[in-house]
């Protein structure tokens, strides 16, 4: 009747040998409405037994429990929680022979081991029910009526509100009461008269007037009473499910927020935050005489580029504070080993200075080489927090004021520009764009003598309106419409607003972000398309992804010749319930299943179903990476040099889960695609003119690069099997 519980929980088992009990002739008047035991016997593992002449496991049928409302605050003396022996009343405080003692459950407090927390929720008994319905939001939840449950007398309303107790959330205790073979007069329903259930369903019997006049606190004074135990179990279960519902709702909200905010709507994407829990590499600089390790810290980034590090969150004073300057930069992010089966995202904060050197090769040349000094090395196991930190620091570096330093005299003057287009887009499962944006960042590195002013003009549509000399005669070249822009503090903003010419006094030997602006996507087709489908059949899940390169006919005239896509990363999020199915165990360590290029996984190939999860790819490699909590498909270059342009590439991984309950209905339905295309711009940005106000012009270098970040919706298909409830699949489509 009751689910199996840990070793020290009270369980009731049906005894087929016990027949229906006979009605006692000496019952008090107020006890005639109490339910019969229905042949239950008590299993109390781990509890002490006192020696006695009679046994509590006798096969003699139990009579109906005798309840004394005034003198028996504990369980009924003839209930399954108290085996009847003789009519000897016993001594107060001493248990009767042949009975089991129920020890009190300690009060829930902050220093108690039974304090309500999410980590101890596994110790609580649960009713055997469908978890996918019990933990879903309101639109997917079951429609069974839930009885109201009152708060215990020991918990005041303020404490109950702080603990998150709610009266309409948990029907578990009601099921326990309905299935139980006996009834306690202390079970009550708030908002209605006190009653308890009889054997015939739907019939109710009221308490006597003596019980109604009973003091309220009398029902919970004795910690050994059945009422006390039931209330404690009820509210421990309430806290567990309340935390589960709260965590599920937060997860759903985070998923919706991530899905809605993937495409940035402003130039600055960082949001105000109190800080992040990070790891600091200690000691900060490498030492040949000592080893380095990770130490947990709490990190804050204040306006003005101030980094504050605390030993833990909530402290008033940081143990270290660093002021960033324009010569600081972030290194390339990496993923490193952190534990036996875990990874950590790492980044270095570096201080960079340049020196001019003369090199002697086949011909003499002058180069400017960077001198890099590591300031900090930080890491985080949360990919979302890691990206948020990188975005915040990068934006704070752009907002820093220019630093006045003595100018150097260079033998070879040089100006370098790097134009980086960041494309953001969301694609439906049909392959259509629903939202897109392009944010362009222009980085500048100058080695110029004196305090000369530099100028830069772009193919801005507003520029010919201000000066006709910049009118473009070539009709094939199109201009860009700058919707929003932000400049570094070294730029003369008033001059740009008047003439649309960017004039600035550059920082000496410093790579800084000169400008960022936003434009609309021109609507050109992407270099390749991604189609993802997940098929669910019971506890069997199969995901397939297909990559198709765009043909020359589909490419725009602006794209010109076919350019390669580099460093392709496709992330397929994996629910936490599936992680154990994507790992293999051996004697040394825990490994993630990995698939390299498999030519047999082409379209139309026949593969036998295997009992273990299989990941197959036709190009590149794929594996589950715990750092991203996703299956990551890595491709170095597309189109592949070993295949034709129109040949599709595919990924497939199959999972056989332990149960169909491991398929969450709130699975994040998007795959993330990241890649870069060199020597191109998604915004069609071009440099019209670049130089200094001098007769001697420096060497000029312009580089372009487009970085794509795309969310592709994963199509869900559900194959119905016999006996499966179609309502539990949520938004899945029947195939």
From Swiss-Prot:
Residues 275-408 form the SHD domain. The keyword Cytoplasm applies. Residues 412-715 form the MHD domain. Ubiquitous. SUPFAM superfamilies: Second domain of Mu2 adaptin subunit (ap50) of ap2 adaptor. GO terms for molecular function: clathrin adaptor activity. It comes from the Eukaryota. It is found in: Cytoplasm; Membrane. The keyword NADP does not apply. GO terms for biological process: clathrin-dependent endocytosis; focal adhesion assembly; focal adhesion disassembly; platelet-derived growth factor receptor signaling pathway; regulation of endocytosis; ruffle assembly; substrate-dependent cell migration; synaptic vesicle endocytosis. Residues 1-35 are annotated as: Disordered. One of its GO terms (cellular component) is cell leading edge. In contrast to other members of the family, it does not contain NPF (Asn-Pro-Phe) sites and thereby does not interact with EPS15, EPS15R and ITSN1. Belongs to the Stoned B family. PANTHER family: AP COMPLEX SUBUNIT MU. This is Stonin-1.
């Amino acid at each position: 009747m009751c689910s199996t519980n840990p070793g020290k929980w009270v369980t009731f088992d049906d005894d087929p040998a016990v027949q229906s009990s006979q009605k006692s002739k000496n019952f008090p008047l107020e006890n005639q409405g109490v339910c019969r035991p229905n042949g239950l016997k008590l299993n109390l593992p781990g509890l002490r037994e006192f020696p006695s002449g009679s046994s509590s496991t006798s096969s003699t049928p139990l009579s109906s429990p005798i309840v004394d409302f005034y003198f028996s605050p504990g369980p009924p003396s003839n209930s399954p929680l108290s085996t009847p022996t003789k009519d000897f009343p016993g001594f107060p405080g001493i248990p009767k022979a042949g009975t089991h003692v129920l020890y009190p459950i300690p009060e829930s407090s902050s220093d108690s081991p039974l304090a309500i927390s999410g980590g101890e929720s596994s110790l609580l008994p649960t009713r055997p029910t469908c978890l996918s319905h019990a933990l879903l939001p309101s639109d997917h939840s079951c429609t069974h009526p839930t009885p109201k449950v009152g708060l215990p007398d020991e918990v005041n309303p303020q404490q109950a509100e702080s603990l998150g107790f709610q009266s309409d959330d948990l029907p578990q205790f009601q099921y326990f009461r309905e299935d139980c073979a006996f009834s306690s007069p202390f079970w009550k329903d708030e908002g209605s008269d006190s009653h308890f259930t009889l054997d015939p369903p739907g019939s109710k019997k009221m308490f006597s007037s003596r019980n109604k006049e009973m003091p309220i606190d009398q029902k919970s004074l004795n910690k050994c009473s059945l009422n006390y135990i039931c209330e404690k179990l009820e509210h421990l279960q309430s806290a567990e499910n309340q935390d589960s519902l709260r965590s599920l709702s937060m997860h759903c909200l985070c998923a919706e927020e991530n899905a809605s905010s993937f495409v940035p709507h402003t130039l600055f994407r960082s949001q105000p935050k109190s800080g992040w829990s990070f790891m600091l590499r200690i000691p900060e600089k490498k030492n040949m005489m000592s080893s380095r390790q990770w130490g947990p810290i709490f990190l804050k980034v204040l306006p003005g580029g101030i980094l504050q590090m605390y030993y833990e969150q909530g402290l008033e004073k940081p143990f270290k504070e660093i002021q960033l300057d324009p010569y600081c930069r972030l290194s390339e992010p990496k993923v490193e080993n952190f534990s036996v089966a875990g990874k950590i995202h790492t980044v270095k904060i570096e201080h960079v200075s340049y020196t001019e050197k003369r090199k002697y090769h086949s011909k003499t040349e002058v180069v400017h080489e960077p001198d890099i000094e590591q300031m900090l090395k930080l890491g985080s196991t949360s990919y979302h927090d890691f990206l948020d930190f990188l975005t915040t620091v990068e934006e704070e570096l752009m907002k820093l004021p220019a630093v006045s330093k003595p100018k150097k005299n260079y033998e070879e003057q040089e100006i370098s520009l790097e134009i980086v287009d960041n494309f953001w887009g969301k694609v439906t499962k049909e392959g259509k764009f629903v939202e897109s944006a392009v944010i362009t960042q222009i980085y500048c590195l100058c080695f110029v003598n004196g305090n000369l002013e530099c100028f830069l003009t772009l193919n801005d549509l507003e520029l010919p309106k201000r000066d006709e000399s910049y009118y473009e005669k070539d009709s094939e070249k199109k201009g860009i419409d700058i919707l929003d822009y932000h400049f570094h503090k070294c730029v003369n903003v008033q001059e740009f607003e008047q003439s649309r010419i960017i004039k600035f006094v550059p920082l000496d030997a410093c790579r800084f972000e000169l400008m960022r602006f936003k434009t609309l996507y021109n609507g050109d087709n992407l270099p390749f398309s991604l189609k993802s489908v997940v098929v669910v059949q019971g506890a069997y899940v199969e995901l397939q992804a297909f990559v198709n390169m765009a043909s020359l006919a589909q490419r725009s005239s602006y794209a010109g010749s076919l350019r390669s896509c580099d460093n392709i990363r496709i992330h397929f999020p994996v629910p936490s319930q599936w992680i154990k199915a994507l790992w293999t165990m051996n004697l040394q360590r825990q490994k993630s299943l990995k698939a390299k290029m498999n030519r047999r996984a082409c379209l139309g190939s026949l593969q036998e179903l295997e009992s273990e999860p299989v990941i197959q790819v036709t190009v590149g490699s794929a594996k589950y990476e715990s750092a991203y909590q996703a299956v990551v498909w890595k491709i170095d270059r597309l189109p592949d040099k070993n295949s034709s342009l129109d040949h599709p590439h595919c990924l497939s991984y199959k999972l056989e889960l332990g149960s169909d309950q491991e398929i969450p209905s709130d699975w994040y339905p998007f795959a993330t695609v990241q890649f870069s295309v060199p020597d191109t711009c998604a915004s069609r940005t071009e440099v019209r003119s670049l130089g200094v106000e001098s007769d001697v012009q420096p060497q000029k270098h312009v580089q372009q690069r487009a970085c794509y970040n795309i969310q592709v919706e994963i199509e869900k298909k559900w194959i119905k099997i016999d006996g499966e409830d179609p309502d539990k699949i949520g938004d899945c489509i029947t195939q």
